[in-house]
């Protein structure tokens, strides 16, 4: 099955017209199967370029998260020392960035406070905003909160669960 997955992916063109079909195809496979396929592609065993820490998912019943990465960095431990208008502008620039993204994208957000994360960017509000922009899910090394209030169909994979949003603010976009 791993070799079949590798050969099928190799046969699909990566141009924008086929990308949606490729992403839908890849959603059929779990992470261990993808790791095995990478070993087939590399021609050797021992692939280990993956997260080794325990992660948590907002819903284990959701389909695998597959898509084009939308990247940003956030921080929540301390309030930003820049002018309020600059922080608001960057937040709006981030929302513009995700609103114009290729559909079937995944938000990949690095919390620069890691490993001492204190504020969750991913909660009810941001999960709903991203889902309404047709982002298919999120991955972060930071925190998630509001587990019972997150929208269905928008899985979030996070390093941990935490109750606070702290002083969360976007630091960098499209990195």
Task: Show which residues each predicted segment covers.
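Short, composition-biased local secondary-structure segments
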Residues: 2-7, 86-104
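N-terminal low-complexity or amphipathic/hydrophobic leaders
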Residues: 11-93
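General beta-strand structural signal in soluble alpha/beta enzymes
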Residues: 47-50, 74, 108-110, 138-142, ...
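Solvent-exposed alpha-helices and their adjacent loops that cap or buttress functional pockets
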Residues: 62-65, 98-102, 131-132, 148-150, ...
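Extracellular/luminal Protease-associated
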Residues: 96-141
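Acidic, glycine-rich active-site loops and adjacent beta-strand->loop/helix elements
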Residues: 112-114, 143-146, 160-163
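Glycine-rich phosphate- or other oxyanion-binding loops that anchor nucleotides, phosphorylated ligands
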Residues: 140, 150-153
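Acidic, glycine-rich flexible loop/linker segments
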Residues: 155, 159-175
């Amino acid at each position: 099955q791993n070799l079949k997955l590798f050969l099928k992916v190799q046969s699909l063109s990566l141009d924008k017209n086929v990308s949606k079909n490729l992403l839908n195809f890849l959603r059929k496979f779990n992470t261990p199967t993808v790791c095995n396929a990478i070993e087939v592609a590399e021609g050797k065993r021992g692939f280990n370029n993956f997260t080794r820490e325990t992660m948590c998912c907002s819903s284990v019943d959701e389909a695998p998260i597959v898509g084009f990465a939308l990247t940003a960095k956030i921080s929540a431990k301390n309030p930003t020392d820049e002018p309020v208008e600059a922080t608001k502008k960057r937040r709006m620039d981030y929302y513009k960035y995700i609103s114009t993204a290729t559909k079937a994208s995944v938000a990949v957000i690095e919390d620069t406070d890691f490993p001492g994360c204190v504020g969750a960017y991913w909660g009810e509000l941001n999960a709903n905003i991203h889902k309404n922009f047709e982002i298919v899910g999120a991955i972060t090394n930071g925190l998630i909160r509001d587990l019972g209030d997150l929208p269905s169909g928008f899985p979030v994979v996070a390093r941990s669960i935490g109750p606070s949003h702290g002083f969360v603010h976007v630091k960098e976009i499209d990195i």
